[in-house]
């Protein structure tokens, strides 16, 4: 039998070099070459391979126990009370301790479920604390109840006012004929959004009638319609239709006053939308005419200390102590003398008659650098009175997700800002906006969507107000006060002001303290772990280490199961492979002969004794014994030999 040896290994062996340090370039005299010291990279790679080999052998071997042996070992070595008694006592006590262990395990799991569910409910507890320190005075926004001066916008509302007067005549005297009076009216606005009368006496067949009937088309209204409108059960509504007129909705009102006011505001909004905002600012009340006197603490102030903004419903509004460009003003003491005092002229004689039905000042207290939603959160101060407002400060600190759906700055609220795509003028001039807005406003689903989408602020400051009023000025001092104010504003010796146009405000801190209402987690992670550990220790005398032991036994069970499944798959594969061969497996002699038959000569068929040998027949070599497996011929690095031996020992 021939023995094949790699020449490279033989060459290295003859020259006395171990095969793992033999130079690859053949330069044996290189000074940089160091005997017996492999490179750092090769050494690190060898250690990693050895570590992975050990881990692979350990995974293949498994825990080395059966299921029963693992259970017995766990019960005998665990620190949990109960399992050890199951394997150490007699049959009756084993059964008793087994049932007790199951019962207490179920109790622990039940208690754990209650505590985890309570923790995941994200309940909060509220604490109230009172503090004393110098506080920032709130920002004060004031607006006139009338957005514009009627003398400056009268030319814009000429057609609308004439149509409004005709509507009032129809409501007050419907039995009179107004055919001649309505022929000169501009019905272009009316035809798109008219006021109608709805007869609801028959709820199954309600009748809808135009307030003007067919007069604006040159015809007279029937007497039957007049009788219906005079009867009880006839309500006024505003018809809102889409741009193509295919879809219409009716907004009902219980009073004609509400109906005509809302209709007039809607039409006026469309008219004002066609006017540039700068012109609208000039048509509203300027600060130097509205703010007659100002005093904050002991320091005088004027309209220049206010920031002007334009609000669509109230025109020019003025904000004191907004803090956008300057530092917020503090207040160190409570009382009227340390607050803000204002005397305002609302100019009630120049109010728009159909647009502003309330006379007075709309005001709101809010935080610095926050936009005032004065239409929703503001209050009115009546003209001819001195209104004193005492302020109490409440600071609210809510917890965010997952305890409450609050927002810090509103950036995460998923609401599309239409002002980034369309400007305000374009949106209002679209004739279809009223119908769309009315549908959304009356939609219950849309309200629920808004409630779920809009979030309250996590940190908020609320100003609780105590309001008191008194007549101002009194009849005894009315003459000289109005003389002085008229001279200061108009440099006139005559009185240009009246009681119905004057408002005096006093805004101050009622108490020198503030309340902080703060939310905190009612059940935090410390509470949860304490209760879980307490229940586990009380019922079973266990701890976290006992849970780790239980997790270890579960991992061993899974490990053994995987090894058994792999072994089963291998055995099935071997059975399929053996089933594909019909004959018996080859013997050792046949395998040796296959390795020594280098000529690959076919076996000879049996011949009769009369036939002679073939002429070219050659005698086959007699098979010898296989060569011994000498360890000296296994030319491998010593590190590899060590790793193999250690892997076998794992």
UniProtKB/Swiss-Prot annotation:
Swiss-Prot/TrEMBL catalytic activity: Na(+)(in) = Na(+)(out)
Record bears the keyword Transmembrane helix: yes
Anything known on activity regulation? Answer: Originally identified and characterized by its inhibition by the diuretic drug amiloride.
Q: What UniProt keywords are attached to this protein's entry?
A: Cell membrane, Cytoplasmic vesicle, Disulfide bond, Glycoprotein, Ion channel, Ion transport, Membrane, Phosphoprotein, Sodium, Sodium channel, Sodium transport, Transmembrane, Transmembrane helix, Transport, Ubl conjugation
Question: GO MF terms on file?
Answer: ligand-gated sodium channel activity
Does this UniProt record's set of keywords contain Transmembrane helix? yes
Name positions with the PTM Phosphoserine: 643, 645
Q: Glycosylated residues? A: 244, 305
Q: List the disulfide bonds.
A: 143-317, 229-234, 241-248, 294-301, 406-458
Q: Which GO terms describe its cellular component?
A: apical plasma membrane; cytoplasmic vesicle membrane; plasma membrane; sodium channel complex
Example of a GO biological process term: sodium ion transmembrane transport
Q: Which residues lie on this side of the membrane: Cytoplasmic?
A: 1-95, 564-650
Mind telling me which residue stretches traverse the membrane in this protein? 96-116, 543-563
Quaternary structure, per UniProt, is: Component of the heterotrimeric epithelial sodium channel (ENaC) composed of an alpha/SCNN1A, a beta/SCNN1B and a gamma/SCNN1G subunit. An additional delta/SCNN1D subunit can replace the alpha/SCNN1A subunit to form an alternative channel with specific properties. Interacts with WWP1 (via WW domains). Interacts with WWP2 (via WW domains); inhibits the channel. Interacts with the full-length immature form of PCSK9 (pro-PCSK9). Interacts (N-glycosylated) with BPIFA1; the interaction is direct and inhibits the proteolytic processing of SCNN1A and SCNN1G and the activation of ENaC.
Q: Its family? A: Belongs to the amiloride-sensitive sodium channel (TC 1.A.6) family. SCNN1B subfamily.
Protein name, as recorded = Epithelial sodium channel subunit beta
What lineage does the source organism belong to?
Eukaryota, Metazoa, Chordata, Craniata, Vertebrata
Gene designation: SCNN1B
